[in-house]
Amino acid sequence: GLDMMLRTCTIQTNLDYSSEADMVQKFRVSLALQPIATALFASSPFTEGKPNGYMSYRSHIWTDTDPARTGMLPFVFEQGFGYERYVDYMLDVPMYFVFRNGKYIDAAGQSFRDFLKGELPALPGEKPHISDWNDHLSTAFPEVRLKSFLEMRGADGGPWNRICALPALWVGLLYDQGALDAAWDLVKGWSIEEQQVLRDAVPSEGLDAPAPGGGTVGELAHRVLDIAAAGLAARGEVNSMGDNEVGFLEPLRRIAKSGKSPAHDLLDRYEGPWGGDLSKIYDELSF
């Protein structure tokens, strides 16, 4: 947990949904494709100034963090999934705290179900406010998190052009119905087991990881980026120069074309011109 909080950095994108059915489709697509984003953005190959054996150490750390509140949420793909099922999941996520009168009250491991009944050991006789529920929603950390929006949580941090590329990727996939349907067609045949194997392989293998159905994640990334580009083009949002949003995907196109996650470039520099001195990263890559 401390490694996650103190040693990792992410870029996240929050996206709206228009209805329960829209939420379900977007949730499923974004969960299934989250490892593709992880591979495209993977850029955390160092720990304590040395290579750590991972393309995305940040993503790996999440595999060793409280399983009760992390992961790929296979129940999202079950028939009948909707708001109620996610509420049931959150009610079973152990609590961390209750915030009252400007202070945090330790409720670690206690049950929100008991809180609803006024039987929370940390606050006996009290029932939750809606703010307590909102706080509790923020204490689960799956690969995609549901609130009043969907939160994409798979990408490592990076330079400004990748910061702009992440929302372009997900907006392109999720905000045009044709693109969303195409993305769902791409992933709907993947089993829960295949999704988990993909998620587990990407932190260490990046774009070289095997993809469901054959080929590599790098090859799959080209198809995903094509769908996202079509979605952005269909949106037709343009700037003052008449350019649409597709250009924001170009950094990801270059990564996919190279077949190497950004971590590979960092490792090449570390082993080459940096001569094993990671402090040179600050001179070359600060922004």
What are these model-derived regions, one by one?
Residues 1-145:
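Loop-rich catalytic cores of soluble enzymes, especially ATP-dependent carboxylate-amine ligases
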Residues 228-287:
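C-terminal amphipathic alpha-helical interaction region
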Residues 31, 44, 48, 55, ...:
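Residue-level signal for alpha-helical context at structural boundaries
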Residues 36, 40-43, 143, 176, ...:
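A structural signal for alpha-helix termini and helix-coil/disorder junctions
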Residues 144-145, 153-241:
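Substrate-recognition/cap regions that form aromatic- and gly/pro-loop-enriched pockets
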